[in-house]
Design a protein with these regions (language model features):
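Short beta-strand segments at enzyme active-site cores
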Residues: 1-3, 99
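Conserved beta-strand edge residues that scaffold enzyme active sites
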Residues: 4-6, 103
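Histidine-acidic metal/acid-base catalytic patches
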Residues: 15-121
Length: 121
């Protein structure tokens, strides 16, 4: 289940804080029901991304990237430090994929390659 922000993009979306999603996972009670942690959305709603990832790692099954503000490239024009975030994700033991989910304002293939380089820690 993917958490989205209700502040900018998805007004009135129910799952807009990680803790809400974690509580839902506990209620469902299945090891097959987990969270998709969208770093862009959760930065907007709650910040403290690295601490949240570490705290709730057992409930997260997948990650999405995206620059903030604007959900554009993950480069030095936005506020998230993706090398540090990805190192924290790796330190949790996560072995899955990191989805590059952003809206490029430059050449899409160049932006995607840049995203891979930034996240290759």
């Amino acid at each position: 289940m993917e958490g989205l922000n209700s502040k900018v993009d998805h007004k009135d979306y129910m799952y807009d804080y990680t803790k809400w999603g974690v509580e839902l996972c506990k209620l469902v009670g299945s090891p097959r029901f987990k969270l998709l942690y969208d770093i862009y959305h959760m930065q907007i709603m709650e910040g403290d991304v690295i601490r949240t990832i570490r705290q709730y790692k057992d409930y997260i099954a997948h990650y999405h990237t995206g620059g903030n503000p604007g959900r554009h490239e993950i480069d030095d024009t936005q506020e998230l430090n993706y090398p540090a975030i990805v190192r924290a994700i790796v330190a949790t033991g996560y072995k899955g994929f990191l989805g590059q989910e952003f809206i490029p304002v430059r050449d899409p293939m160049e932006s995607l390659a840049q995203g891979f380089r930034i996240c290759d820690v």
